[in-house]
C-alpha cells in the first residue's frame, strides 16, 4: 500500500 508493490 502507497509504495507501488505494497
Swiss-Prot record:
GO biological processes: defense response
Superkingdom field: Eukaryota
Changes after translation: This is a cyclic peptide.
The entry's keywords: Plant defense
Cross-link Cyclopeptide (Pro-Tyr) residue location(s): 1-6
Function in brief: Probably participates in a plant defense mechanism. Has cytotoxic activity against human nasopharyngeal carcinoma with an IC(50) of 17 nM.
Protein name stated in the entry: Cyclopeptide E
Amino acid at each position: 500500500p502507497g509504495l507501488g508493490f505494497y
